[in-house]
Regions:
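Extracytoplasmic
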Residues: 3-521
């Protein structure tokens, strides 16, 4: 009898805890709009300004045009070059330009119309250390913005062989080998904060472009000042596709592509893995190690991509479903850009997102109303590439990076005045000595509150990581109201800045596992 009562009490206790958790999740998310509404958050305060950002670069040329014509650079007519060599009859090309790890090469380019252009390159990697290639890009002898100093170019990897099976029936993952093939890309943000390729401003007339080696050699076959294309919407995409649908013999076509069967990938760490935790992972075995998914912990940084091949039996429209799992970061979403045959078919494919969920999620690529996108494919073999992106959170993380930079400026200024351990019994009159610091703290507090609101709106809930920004916003608000708190909490202030920096790094991770992709006729 006593045992039954005790068991009943435990059950009731568990139920109470579950009810409390549900009620907590149903609480309306706190909103801070009244704290920053009507405030010019773009204002600069003396001593707390970050120069050299891409945003400031764009703003400096905000009235510039976006010319419609591409301008191809003559790779082999370079003005100056160190660590460069012209290759002939190289990898199917009559000529190509080798650039060493520490190379510097400058080209002249005549620009008919001033404005913004993307920088488009076609390149191939060469055998080296196997890490990402890095270059700095200078326009007319100057770094246009700080992040142009580290433009990243990925490599291509594949399996050296089919998986082997040991005498116990366990699959052995094949080693990774580099694939040396021509690739095309635009110069873009390696952190993923800026989704679209960088826009570079060129004056009308003669300009120079300099590429300086930072890491690893590469061979170029093309460099173009590319006109900035407006991405098409799904509606526009459909309007440009043939009107014919699938034949009656093709209406039930289904092809399942296993995640572990990816053909190529951007890093050697994106190999096939095994999962025994979920029986709906396919293929599945309780007893043996079976390679049955790809990605996961290592597929975490913007720009990393995985590509699969698939085929369709005839021209027509097809739907695509991705079976993915984001069980790595509660309160976050993991996003991917979808490329079909090397191109993003329409702007809605720039970001597909997986919310946090313990189990696999079958995500059919569809609009906001759940209507599957119809992808037009011709008969034969095609590729689908999923590239990690920060999506809508990227711009918010960039704003947090800028905020951390400004907060460190504020901290260092106060550090010079008060020392690392301020006297708790001394009134430093910081609000009188440094009124600009108080103004900067007030503005930064409001910026952080706004970022918290926008991140919560994007993810649908407040994760612990973004709560760090709220903690700092509240502390800054407290400093403005009671300046004497600055010296009392000076060490905590520095710790909170450090914690926010760590949180930004963590929020910049976008981990995702892929079990399979399913292509079906419409």
């Amino acid at each position: 009898m006593k045992g039954s009562v005790k068991k009943a009490i435990i059950i009731i206790g568990v139920l109470i805890v579950l009810v409390i958790c549900v009620l907590l999740n149903l609480r309306p998310v706190e909103n801070f709009q009244q704290k920053y509404e009507g405030v010019d958050l773009s204002a600069d305060v003396e001593g707390a300004v970050r120069e050299g950002t891409y945003t400031k670069y764009l703003n400096a040329h905000e009235d510039a045009a976006c010319p419609a014509e591409d301008i191809e650079v003559d790779l082999f007519a370079y003005m100056e070059g160190e660590g460069v060599e012209v290759y002939e009859n190289y990898e199917g090309e009559e000529k190509a330009l080798y650039t060493d790890t520490e190379s510097t090469v400058t080209w002249k380019v005549n620009v008919p119309e001033a404005g913004f252009y993307n920088l488009y390159l076609e390149y191939i990697t060469v055998e080296s250390r196997g890490v990402a290639i890095e270059r700095s890009v200078y326009i007319n002898g100057e770094l246009p913005f700080d992040d142009a100093g580290n433009i990243i170019f990925t490599r291509t990897w594949t399996d050296a062989s089919e998986p082997k099976v040991d005498n116990q029936g366990n699959e052995i993952r094949p080693s990774q080998v580099e694939v040396y093939k021509w690739q095309s890309t635009f110069c873009k943000d390696d952190m993923g904060y800026i989704i679209n390729p960088y826009q570079f401003y060129f004056e009308a007339g003669e300009n120079t472009i300099t590429m300086e080696g930072v890491n690893e050699p590469m061979v170029l076959k093309k460099l173009t000042l590319a006109a900035i294309d407006d991405s098409v919407t799904y509606e526009e995409y459909l309007a440009n596709c043939p009107g014919e649908g699938n034949s009656e013999t093709n209406i039930n076509y289904v092809q399942v592509v296993q995640g572990e069967d990816s053909t190529i990938r951007s890093e050697s760490s994106l190999y096939a893995k095994y999962d025994k935790s979920a029986p709906n992972t396919q293929p599945y075995s309780v007893t043996n190690t079976i390679l049955n998914y790809v990605g996961g912990e290592t597929w975490c940084s913007a720009g990393q991509w995985i590509e699969w091949e698939f085929s369709v039996p005839e021209d027509g429209y097809y739907n695509i479903t991705v079976k993915g799992r984001q069980n790595y970061a509660r309160g976050s979403v993991s996003s991917r850009t979808v490329y079909i045959d090397g191109e993003i078919p329409f702007e809605e494919m720039e970001e597909i997102s997986f919310e946090y969920e313990n189990d696999w999620n079958n995500l059919t690529l569809a609009d906001a109303d759940g209507n599957p996108y119809k992808i037009y494919l011709t008969e034969g073999t095609h590729t689908i590439r999923l590239e990690a992106t920060l999506g809508g959170s990227g711009i918010l993380l960039e704003e947090l990076e800028d905020s951390i930079y400004r907060l460190n400026q504020i901290y260092r200024k106060l550090l010079v005045y008060t020392g690392a351990t301020p006297d708790q019994y001394r009134d430093y009159n910081i609000d009188q000595v440094y009124p600009e610091v108080m103004e900067a703290m007030d503005l930064e507090s409001k910026r952080l509150y706004k970022i918290v609101d926008e991140m919560v709106a994007y993810t649908g809930q407040k994760a612990d990581k973004i709560a760090t920004a709220q903690t700092l916003a509240q502390q800054l608000e407290r400093f403005v109201e009671k300046p004497n708190k600055i010296t009392e909490e000076f060490t905590t202030f520095k710790d909170n800045i450090t914690s926010l920096g760590t949180a930004v790094l963590n929020m910049g991770e976008t981990k995702l596992g892929i079990d399979s992709l399913v292509i079906t006729s419409t």
